[in-house]
């Protein structure tokens, strides 16, 4: 099949959305006779980690911030309107994949009129994500258009793919009361087949590692709340425990708050693996946002037991109760912490389970199975 793939994410760097989108692009490229990729670029930074078989068409959007805000108010929520029409008319595509509902907005009906099948990948229940991450003046117009484009995508796609079961249920409840939409869970996976995990010795000391984008509200605010409510419990249960938090672009106020409580902050590390190898346990306290918290994969990939807020455990159900322990209250945190410290674990076993679930090959197999049982069956 010939596939046109349109993504909302800049395909360079190490963000969670970037990681997931690379995997989807490469998996669809693997399963397609030919894949054309429309992707955003800025500052002429080329996409990274994309299958060489993909035909890449980069699209820039160099406008001042005030003009972008006017575009948002008018409902111009992506950059692909003109170029998409040209590419769609240039050849016959069997399948068009929209990577987020945003890039499908006002394009999906054009695709359907051409007789192409449509897949939309939902990285989050987008309305919930907007509520948790954006403030005035962007929040309200973005939320308004998000509701419209998310509904349009769910109701007009031949197949909707989500990263978690929770998001599948949220989308169905919000936009599919009639039960007509096809919504399946694909999860996430590595974007290349040589991304095998490496076994390194973990710290023998009780060192807890937290990673994430420290410029995002859904990372910073829950962590500050965790420091206030849960850090005293951690230090009570594990005297001498050390907490290290690493991520890009932390605010100075965040760094000061951490240092006051004796938490080490590693700013914008160039090698996250070296930070992870300093720890023994992985901690994910994020309690906001939808989608899947890809940073939990950092811990599992390195063979570390994970302690996560139940919101952060979405998408990791096969690991819950074993490699991943969950909490949502101080009492459940204390219980999960004690279990994690007393139950023996094997680094190689955790890594093997990670590979079985999140390897590139596992992702391709999941995608192929979903396509064959849905749109390719038609």
Model-identified regions with their sequence ranges:
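Conserved catalytic-core segment of nucleotide-activated headgroup transferases in glycan assembly
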Residues: 26, 185-257, 261, 265-273, ...
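Membrane-proximal helix-turn-helix segments that form the acceptor-binding/catalytic region
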Residues: 85, 126, 140-160
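A charged, aromatic-enriched C-terminal amphipathic alpha-helix characteristic of glycosyltransferases
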Residues: 342-375
């Amino acid at each position: 099949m010939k596939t046109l793939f349109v993504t909302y994410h800049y395909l360079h760097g190490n963000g969670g959305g970037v990681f997931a989108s690379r995997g989807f692009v490469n998996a669809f490229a693997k399963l397609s006779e030919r894949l054309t990729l429309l992707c955003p670029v800025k500052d002429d930074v080329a996409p990274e980690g994309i299958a060489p078989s993909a035909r890449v068409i980069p699209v820039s959007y160099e406008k001042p911030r005030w003009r972008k805000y006017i575009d948002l108010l008018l409902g111009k929520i992506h950059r692909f309107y003109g170029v998409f029409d040209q590419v769609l008319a240039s050849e016959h595509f069997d399948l068009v994949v929209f990577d987020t509902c945003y890039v499908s907005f006002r394009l999906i009906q054009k695709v359907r009129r051409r007789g192409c099948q449509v897949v939309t990948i939902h990285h989050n229940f987008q309305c919930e994500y907007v509520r948790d991450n954006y403030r005035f003046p962007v929040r309200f117009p973005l939320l308004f258009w998000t509701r419209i484009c998310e509904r349009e995508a769910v109701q007009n796609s031949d197949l909707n793919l989500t990263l978690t079961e929770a998001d599948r249920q949220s989308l169905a409840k919000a936009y599919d009361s009639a039960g007509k939409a096809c919504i399946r869970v694909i999860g996430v996976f590595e974007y290349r087949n040589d991304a095998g995990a490496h076994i390194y010795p973990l710290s023998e000391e009780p060192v807890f590692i937290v990673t994430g984008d420290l410029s995002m509200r859904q990372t910073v605010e829950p962590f500050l709340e965790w420091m206030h409510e849960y850090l005293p419990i951690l230090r009570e249960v594990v005297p001498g425990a050390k907490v290290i938090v690493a991520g890009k672009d932390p605010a100075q106020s965040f760094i000061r708050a951490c240092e006051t409580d004796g938490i080490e902050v590693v700013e914008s590390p160039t090698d996250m693996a070296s930070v992870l190898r300093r720890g023994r346990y992985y901690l994910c306290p994020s309690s906001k946002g939808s989608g899947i918290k890809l940073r939990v994969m950092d811990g599992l990939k390195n063979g570390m037991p994970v302690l996560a807020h139940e919101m952060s455990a979405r998408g990791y159900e096969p690991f819950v109760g074993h490699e991943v322990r969950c909490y949502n209250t101080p009492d459940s945190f204390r219980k999960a912490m004690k279990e994690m410290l007393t139950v023996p674990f094997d680094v190689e076993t955790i890594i093997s389970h990670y590979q079985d679930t999140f390897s590139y090959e596992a992702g391709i197999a999941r995608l192929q199975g979903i396509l064959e049982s849905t749109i390719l069956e038609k």
